[in-house]
Amino acid sequence: QAGKLVLMRADGEITNTHFRPMRKPMGMAVKSDRLTVGTAFGISDLRNTPAAAGTLEPHGKHDALFLPRAEYYTGDIDIHEMAWQNNELFFVNTRFSCLCKLNPDYSFDPVWRPAFISAYDPRDRCHLNGLALRDGKIRYVSALSQTDTPGGWRQHNSDGGVVIDLQNNQIVADK
């Protein structure tokens, strides 16, 4: 389902789904009672409201209800992946080829970019697209290529790809 966040829950022997319209949902992060989603132009922060979940029909079937509590405008930066590290939200800013953290005072706050990226540029130079945590800290990011030209990754779509260790800024896997 394009343009929808799909929420699922067990309902006896079946899986029940609920579709919530969102504009281009991609990256998602979960932290205790929070569900945070990167969308076409921002970040939506939803919070679990258990007391309200009990009022949903049919009664007794819902143990969580995530309601929108905050929206942050980022612009069209193509958020591909997100994660909570302690109390800070980090996300992959694919258009600017960098890792960012949420800062309510700015559209985004860049904290790291690959060594092969020479400047912040909204033209997607390497298609930075994934991240992974280790021991609760962001440790790895992935990109489709090591290119530093606007859209240069497209020429390596099927034969590129790297994983970078943020601890030492080294490529630990490539295709």
Language-model regions: role of each:
Residues 1-175:
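Sequence-structural signature of mature extracellular/luminal beta-sheet repeat domains
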